[in-house]
């Protein structure tokens, strides 16, 4: 009886305090600002606006540009840990981390079991302890095994508890390489309606390096999609220095007057090939580069440029990013 009375008094006391508390007045702008952690200023990294003769650098394949961005990030951040299946001695399924374990050691380049949920959870745990982490999904298809960790833990931990989820998840994605239905999916749309995540998808080697560096420097969780079919088929100039491409900023590939194509990833190369084969059509091509947050200013400019828009992506038509952008254009 004494214990019950003690708890009853405690409950009644807490209830009285709760009823005396003034109701919370929600402020939408403040709530939205709390979705992402602020990115700290960095003096030793340049933001690359565009390639020109002064900064173009040497020709590299997309896969090599990703590896270079990852290696420079490891050199820049002694607290950066890489994790994934067979990424150490073997160098990963696509050999992006080949030689990394010899240069940076097994403490920073870690093989993991075949358990994506555990890898994402370990990456988040490292972040809570002050580390940065990059985990490699061997194939983007298997992100489903780690889905709960990503959308309910990584994406929400800063908004809910003020803790950073300083994690980048690299996602080898896309079809066209004869890999079958379990190794060829384009699943970026699964994540673009999850507040707290950032989603990037480069199409060129220069953007691949710069966006990866930007993702690692960002204190928020970033889903970094890289198309497998572009790894060794696409080359381009890549600056040698350590630089970022701004997350949330699209790239104008070329101007045009007849129609605008808004696309990203492999779609950029499809659009460029179509343009070469149809020189009689003046085509405006916009490479989104970032899918969350979208660059709505650039999208608006693309619409205004021609008054006609084609949305091009590899992902499933129903529920894809193209439909969302089409709806936004219609609304505005």
Residue positions per predicted region:
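Acidic-histidine catalytic/liganding microenvironments
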Residues: 21, 77, 194, 218, ...
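Proline-centered turn/helix-capping motifs that create local helix->coil transitions or kinks
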Residues: 23-27, 219, 223, 232-237
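Flexible, glycine/charged-enriched surface loops at secondary-structure junctions
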Residues: 22-31, 85, 164, 280-288
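Thiamine diphosphate
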Residues: 1-16, 32-225, 229-230, ...
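Terminal amphipathic helices with adjacent charged low-complexity linkers/tails
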Residues: 5-53
């Amino acid at each position: 009886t004494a214990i019950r009375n003690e708890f009853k008094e405690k409950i009644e006391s807490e209830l009285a305090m709760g009823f005396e508390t003034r109701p919370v007045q929600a402020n939408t702008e403040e709530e939205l600002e709390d979705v992402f952690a602020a990115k700290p200023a960095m003096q030793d990294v340049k933001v690359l606006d565009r390639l020109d003769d002064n900064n173009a650098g040497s020709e590299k394949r997309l896969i090599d540009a990703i590896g270079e961005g990852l290696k420079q990030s490891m050199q820049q951040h002694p607290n950066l840990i890489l994790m994934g299946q067979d990424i150490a001695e073997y160098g990963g399924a696509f050999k992006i981390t080949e030689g990394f374990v010899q240069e940076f050691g097994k403490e920073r380049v870690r093989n993991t079991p075949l358990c994506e949920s555990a890898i994402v959870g370990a990456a988040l745990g490292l972040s809570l302890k002050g580390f940065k982490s990059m985990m490699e999904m061997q194939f983007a298809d298997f992100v489903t095994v780690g889905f709960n960790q990503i959308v309910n833990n990584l994406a929400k931990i800063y908004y809910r508890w003020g803790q950073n989820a300083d994690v980048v998840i690299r996602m080898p994605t896309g079809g066209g390489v004869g890999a079958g239905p379990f190794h060829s999916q384009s699943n970026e749309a699964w994540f673009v309606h999850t507040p707290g995540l950032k989603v990037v998808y480069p199409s060129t080697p220069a953007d691949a390096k710069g966006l990866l560096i930007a993702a690692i420097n960002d204190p928020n969780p970033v889903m970094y999609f890289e198309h497998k079919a572009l790894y060794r088929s696409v080359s381009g100039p890549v600056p040698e220095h350590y630089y970022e491409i701004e997350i949330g900023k699209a790239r104008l590939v070329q101007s045009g007057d007849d129609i605008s194509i808004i696309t990203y990833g492999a779609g950029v190369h499809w659009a460029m090939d179509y343009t070469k084969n149809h020189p009689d059509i003046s085509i405006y091509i916009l490479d989104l580069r970032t899918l969350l947050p979208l660059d709505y200013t650039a999208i608006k400019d693309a619409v205004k440029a021609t008054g006609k828009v084609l949305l091009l992506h590899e992902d499933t038509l129903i529920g894809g990013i193209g439909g969302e952008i089409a709806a936004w254009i219609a609304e505005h």
